C-alpha cells in the first residue's frame, strides 16, 4: 500500500473518530441522569417501547432533566424490559433494573430520578463494583461469561454509527486497508478462526480460496438466515451491533478482492433488516463503504437481501439459489465451490 494513501486513510478516519469521541464525551460528561433502554426484539416484545414512552412522559410530568439512550440486547432476555439508570448525583452506581414496565418507569422517574430512592426491590444489581449494591458481576449468569462477539451489545446505540466508532469500531478496517490482502488472509489463517457449523471449516482457508480465484467478479455473502426454531444469534447481532458485521464484511471483501457484498436475512426479522439497512447508509455517508473507502482504491457496495424464511435457506447452496431468484433448494456440489453463477455472469462467492 502506498504510504501517501495510508496517510489519506488515517486523515479521513481521524476526522470521523474525533467527531465520535466528541459526541461520546459530551454524553458522558453531561451531569444529568442517563436512562439506557434495551430496544432489541426481545425487549420490544416485552413492552420496552411502552416503557420508553412512559419514561418520556414521566420526565416531562415530574420536570426531571435526564437523557434516554436506546441500546440493543444486553443478553438477558429473561429480564426484559431491561433498563440501566446512571444517576450520578444519587451517590449510587449505575443500576440494572429488570422487567421495567410502564408503571415501574413512572415510579422510578418520580422516586429515584427526582427523589433519590432507587427502590431496591426492583434492582437486579449494580453495573459496577461498589459498597452499596451487589454487582451483577457477582452473579453466575455474568461472572462466567467472556463476551467476544456480543461485547458491545446492550451498551451502544445500534442506530448511531458514532457510538460504535467511539468504542473502537472500524479501526480494524483502517488497519486492514494498509495491508496487502495476502497479509490479511495469512493473519486470519494464523488466528485459527473457524466456522461455527459442524464442519468447523477454517476461515483463513476459505478466504485464501476466494482470494486466489482470479479476476472474476467476487461477492461476499453474510449468511444471517436462521431456520432453527428459537434461534436468534444472527438477529441479535444485527439488531444490537450491525456495524460490527459490516466492518467484518468489509475486511473480508478487501482481503478476497470483492467489490460487492450481500447480507442475507429473513424478512421475518423486520427490526434487524431496518437497523442494518440504516447502518449501511450511515457507513456509506461517512465514506466507510461505497467508492474509494476512506480515500483508498477499495470500493464496496453492501445490500440487504430479504429471504422468505425457508428453513433450508440457511444451507449455503440453497441460500445462493434463493439470491439468484430460484427456489431455495440445496444443490450437490463440493463443500467449498467458488465458481458459481449469480445472475448472468460468472462470479466467485465467499460466505
Language-model features and meaning:
Residues 1-351:
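Feature of Fe-S/electron-transfer and energy-metabolism proteins
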Amino acid at each position: 500500500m502506498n504510504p501517501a494513501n495510508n496517510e489519506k486513510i488515517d486523515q479521513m478516519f481521524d476526522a470521523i473518530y474525533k467527531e465520535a469521541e466528541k459526541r461520546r464525551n459530551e454524553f458522558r460528561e453531561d451531569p444529568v441522569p442517563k436512562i439506557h433502554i434495551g430496544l432489541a426484539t426481545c425487549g420490544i416484545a416485552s413492552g420496552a417501547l411502552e416503557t420508553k414512552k412512559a419514561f418520556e412522559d414521566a420526565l416531562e410530568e415530574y420536570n426531571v432533566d435526564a437523557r434516554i439512550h436506546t441500546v440493543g440486547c444486553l443478553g438477558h432476555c429473561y429480564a426484559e424490559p431491561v433498563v440501566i439508570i446512571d444517576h450520578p448525583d444519587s451517590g449510587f452506581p449505575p443500576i440494572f433494573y429488570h422487567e421495567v414496565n410502564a408503571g415501574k418507569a413512572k415510579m422510578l422517574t418520580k422516586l429515584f430520578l427526582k427523589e433519590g430512592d432507587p427502590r431496591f426491590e426492583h434492582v437486579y444489581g449494580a453495573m459496577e463494583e461498589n459498597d452499596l449494591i451487589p454487582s451483577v458481576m457477582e452473579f453466575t449468569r455474568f461472572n462466567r461469561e467472556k463476551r467476544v462477539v456480543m461485547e458491545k451489545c446492550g451498551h451502544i446505540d445500534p442506530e448511531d454509527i458514532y457510538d460504535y466508532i467511539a468504542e473502537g469500531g472500524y479501526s480494524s478496517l483502517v488497519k486492514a486497508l494498509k495491508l496487502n490482502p495476502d497479509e490479511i488472509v495469512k493473519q486470519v489463517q494464523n488466528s485459527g478462526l473457524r466456522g461455527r457449523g459442524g464442519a468447523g471449516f477454517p476461515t483463513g482457508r476459505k478466504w485464501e480460496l476466494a482470494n486466489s480465484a482470479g479476476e472474476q467478479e467476487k461477492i461476499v455473502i453474510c449468511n444471517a438466515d436462521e431456520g432453527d426454531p428459537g434461534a436468534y444469534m444472527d438477529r441479535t447481532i444485527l439488531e444490537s451491533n450491525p456495524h460490527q458485521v459490516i466492518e467484518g464484511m468489509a475486511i473480508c471483501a478487501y482481503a478476497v478482492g470483492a467489490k460487492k457484498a450481500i447480507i442475507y436475512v429473513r424478512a421475518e426479522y423486520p427490526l434487524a433488516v431496518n437497523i442494518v439497512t440504516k447502518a449501511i447508509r450511515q457507513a456509506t455517508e461517512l465514506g466507510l463503504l461505497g467508492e474509494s473507502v476512506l480515500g483508498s482504491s477499495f470500493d464496496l457496495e453492501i445490500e440487504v437481501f430479504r429471504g422468505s424464511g425457508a428453513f433450508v435457506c440457511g444451507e449455503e447452496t440453497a441460500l445462493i439459489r434463493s439470491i439468484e431468484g430460484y427456489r431455495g433448494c440445496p444443490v450437490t456440489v463440493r463443500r467449498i465451490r467458488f465458481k458459481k453463477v449469480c445472475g448472468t455472469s460468472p462470479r466467485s462467492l465467499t460466505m
